[in-house]
Amino acid sequence: MSKGIHFEQSITELEEIVRQLEKGELSLEESLKQFEKGISLARRCQNALNQAEQKIETLTGTDSNIELDSDEQTSD
């Protein structure tokens, strides 16, 4: 569960960095610092998502193609 918390914290922090950069009020040096931090956070989040996807694929025994039971497939 702590990985989920870290993911959520990273997303929140990344959103804040984007807001700061979009305002355009930071100095060039501070903007570069925040951009670098944002890239690091984005990579960390992407890695967490990739790991979650792999775990789901392992648990379902598929590669993102989950088959529905015959009862779930009927739309009538």
UniProtKB/Swiss-Prot annotation:
Q: What class of enzyme is it?
A: hydrolase
Keyword match Cytoplasm: yes
| Broad class of the protein's primary localization | cytoplasm
Q: Which InterPro entries does the annotation name?
A: Exonuc_VII_S, Exonuc_VII_ssu_sf
Q: What cellular component terms from Gene Ontology apply here?
A: cytosol; exodeoxyribonuclease VII complex
Catalyses: Exonucleolytic cleavage in either 5'- to 3'- or 3'- to 5'-direction to yield nucleoside 5'-phosphates
What EC number(s) does its UniProt record assign? Answer: 3.1.11.6
Q: Which UniProt keywords apply?
A: Cytoplasm, Exonuclease, Hydrolase, Nuclease
Keyword Amino-acid biosynthesis in annotation: no
Q: Which family does it belong to?
A: Belongs to the XseB family.
Fill in the subunit field for this protein: Heterooligomer composed of large and small subunits.
> What protein name applies here?
Exodeoxyribonuclease 7 small subunit
